[in-house]
């Protein structure tokens, strides 16, 4: 991959040098031919694969319900008419994606400078402690499926993916600079035996651009079928905006630094977001569906306005967190254990691990429907302010029984249980979330719902515990 010539105007990266886009009519016609040629080239190289960590094939995607492309089944359909109709729909989808790609690549943007030129200015000392350019002024490189991901991100920083192309990564991509990936809904697959796909390491000094900080992925779809490693392993600032993860048998995001997930979707994953010790995690407006461990927090986390459905564990809290305005429905079918506090406990949908020095999480304005909750002993008092526990069972450890305050919650169908002792005669060996197998002691519980429920004959529901400042 050669460094582009910044003096040539109107030439888009990823295209041939003889494709100027100065004339709008010639621009559109030229880009149509180039898009068709690129599609034909990537289609012919799909069998052999691209070198240097990248490869793929442009395909039409009719848009399945889960958002990830699957190959059409040639045996599906019982008549030639059905097969012809299906083929027509696929061709229409392919034409739409090609037109969308052409429209995105032919738009005019106020882009004026390449990332390599900014690095040259920074090395000369002209951009020290100075934000001279903005995100919209940095030129975008349209990456082709045969290009090397690591080389493209390190050279251009701002990279866009073609929505009519399926990208395939075949080796680990090491990112040590500021990077911004504009996905445009493109699908990225993995064909590698490496344990990590994107290794976001500590960044070196470089030029500052307004609107770019750390590593950012925007609107990318990751189809991780058959991949058992980590999609992201980050020790720097990582931002995921509208990213889609599906069928990841490993870890989607493993962060040792600062990670922000906004509007992301996790479907059928083993571990969604994992925040290691001393990490800072922010999760907003994300969807978790049929995951084993949606979120694992060992550091600090802010979890706001998310939705979870049929997860074995929506939140395994080993550190501290602020959990507000989330909706969690249903529980998955699993008998996993957790040994985070030294005792083997059955994993619940909301699982707060006991700790002698850490405080309780802030738990407010959450909706729980047909869920289970485990509360280990912590410092202070746990008060789930204005939360709805609809058909939810809460299991409290012995020391946590006296540290929970259930005033101000919607408790019509809640069930509260206290662990009295553990029956050693009913011990069973179960798999643990740490990867090993442990002996799980069966807890003998006591129903204490009426003892802890608020006395509604003495306390009116019209008090301020159920009101908020934004109500009329």
Swiss-Prot record:
Localization, UniProt: Host nucleus; Host cytoplasm
Residue ranges, compositional bias (Gly residues): 45-57
GO molecular function, one term: ubiquitin-like ligase-substrate adaptor activity
Entry keywords, A to Z: Early protein, Host cytoplasm, Host nucleus, Host-virus interaction, Modulation of host cell apoptosis by virus, Phosphoprotein
Biased composition annotated in UniProt, kind: Low complexity: 32-44
Residues spanning the signal sequence: none
Family that this chain belongs to: Belongs to the adenoviridae E1B 55 kDa protein family.
Job description of the protein: Plays a major role to prevent cellular inhibition of viral genome replication. Assembles an SCF-like E3 ubiquitin ligase complex based on the cellular proteins ELOB, ELOC, CUL5 and RBX1, in cooperation with viral E4orf6. This viral RING-type ligase ubiquitinates cellular substrates and targets them to proteasomal degradation: TP53/p53, LIG4, MRE11-RAD50-NBS1 (MRN) complex, ITGA3, DAXX and BLM. E1B-55K probably acts as the substrate-specific adapter of the SCF-like E3 ubiquitin ligase complex.
Subunit structure: Interacts with host PML-4 and PML-5; this interaction promotes efficient subnuclear targeting of E1B-55K to PML nuclear bodies. Interacts with E4-ORF3 protein. Interacts with E4-ORF6 protein.
Protein name in the entry: E1B 55 kDa protein
Organism listed in the record: Human adenovirus F serotype 41 (HAdV-41)
The organism's taxonomic lineage, starting at the top: Viruses, Varidnaviria, Bamfordvirae, Preplasmiviricota, Tectiliviricetes
